Amino acid sequence: MVTVVKTSPFEGQKPGTSGLRKRVVVFQQPHYTESFIQAIFTAMPAPGPQGATVVVGGDGRFYVKDVVQKIIRIGAANGIARFIIGKDGILSTPAASAVIRARKADGGIILTASHNPGGPENDFGIKYNTRNGGPAPESVTDAMYKATLAMSEYRTIDSIADIDLSALGEQTPFDGFAVEIVDPVEDYVRLTKSIFDFDLIKRFRSENPHFTLLFDALNGVTGPYGQRIFVEELGFPQSSLDQCTPLEDFGGSHPDPNLTYAHRLVERVAKERISLGAASDGDGDRNMVLSHDWFVTPSDSVALIAHHAADCIPYFRSNGGLRGLARSMPTSCAIDRVAQRKGLECFEVPTGWKFFGNLMDAGRLSICGEESFGTGSDHIREKDGIWAIVAWLNIIAHVSQTIPNTSVRSLMLDFFSIYGRNYFTRYDYEEVDAAGAGKMMDRLRGHSTDIVGKSFGGGAFTVAKLDDFEYTDPIDGSLSIKQGIRIVFDDSSRIIFRLSGTGSQGATVRIYIEKYDSIHCDQDTQEALKPLVDAALEISRLEEFTGRKEPTVVT
């Protein structure tokens, strides 16, 4: 029954911060995808694949359904006892985490390249989540990579006919092996309703007919989740949804919720004077929040949610408040100020949601976020776009009980009056020459001593420190090095340089700019930060090393 297929190692099958991402044509090479799937099962944490239950689903992009069938056959040959698979291969990343935890599965395989474009000419990805519902830690991804380097064969059962992914219920290809097709929305909606005050939000909506919502799923996986939660559960009109049909190529667009790629939402929110506009990405773990008169940066969004959560959100009230807060290193320090005021621990971790998981499992972290439009809490072990949007609705509804006409803008201005404002922007230079970008980073690292004390921006900014961020996990002691170059100035302003690991080809240079102001909190962000941006380009000599004069995306 089991067929052993001989193969040899493929170059470059090293999982990044969010699994393995490559062009579709790379995954379509003979034995390429099968070899990586085998590596996942080979490296699966103890007790291993024998008798295990594994959740499988994806963001609906091209090639998902084909790979689901490969996973079923290879998993069966490696001893998996049960697969739990989202209908039609659909399962948002947050929902996959929720299903893993709710069904007490041994892990999950998520087929996504997140916010990267989809379709035959674009990207595909495979990531593995462990039994806590979170992304595999480096110990597991390192074991997977080691398995790819030693790959000589993979096991499969080709006699298993294609499973009907559209039919809910259990199918049993042979004794001792079952495939269960589940509603991809059900467990997630049940969890979300247990976290937030849906009755309060519904009452607010009915009492404030002028309040409008516009949710854009960017033709990614969250369309069905938005339909169920915003329309069927909370009662917003159908017109509150846009681009909510999952498409294999995301409608030919880039499913990344930022001001550049979600321009359709931005334009509609402004034109129609929408009260709360929101978008999610391809696999549903990212979010963007704005209104007709305010754009909320992700750094400010997580900080504001943390400020209000213990008072407004039932999940945190019933759990005795917040245990701790955290952010990725490049994310602005706004949430640090919330933690300080509320007497909470605040952790600074490398980019990659997996670094939050240990803190959550240890009971030391409740809410966290990344500047890359990722926000979440300890209800699951992934960032969660829908969660963040419903959190905003819950907060607006709660505050409106005592302050009528509460809006996104009024909430942010109130927040700044308490904490001051961390002005923040990010410049992305996508698909630049990797060699040139690497040389630029090496040169910056070489400046760690001789740049301190030098001034830039016409003398406005004096360097106090340059380092390459490293992180020692306070729970398991693991060390992560070279996580981003930080330049800190004597006024606490920061410039950070990173090479992203989420692209499928070339390199993406990200520059993060941050400046704090406790007095002038209503400036235009780009105007407030222009001197620091100029200093960043001067220090890095980015154009010289990459040939780029302008960023691909400004957030």
Task: Please describe what each predicted stretch is.
Residues A270-L276, S280, V289-H292, C312-T555:
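Phosphate-binding and adjacent anionic-ligand microenvironments
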Residues M1-A77, T172-L213:
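An N-terminal, well-structured beta->alpha segment
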Residues I84-T93, F295-P298, A326-S328, V349-T351:
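Active-site nucleophile and cofactor-binding loops and adjacent substrate-binding regions
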Residues S18, V56, A96, I109, ...:
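Buried hydrophobic positions in well-ordered alpha/beta secondary-structure cores of metabolic enzymes
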Residues T42, Q50-N122, R228-L290:
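N-terminal small/polar loop signature for handling phosphorylated ligands or for N-terminal nucleophile
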Residues N132-I163, D300-R323, R327-R337:
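Glycine-rich phosphate-binding loop plus the immediately following alpha-helix
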Residues V2-F10, P120-A270:
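Gly/Ser/Thr-enriched, mixed-charge loops and adjacent short helices
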Residues P120-A150, L290-I305, E382-L393:
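A short, gly/pro- and small-residue-rich
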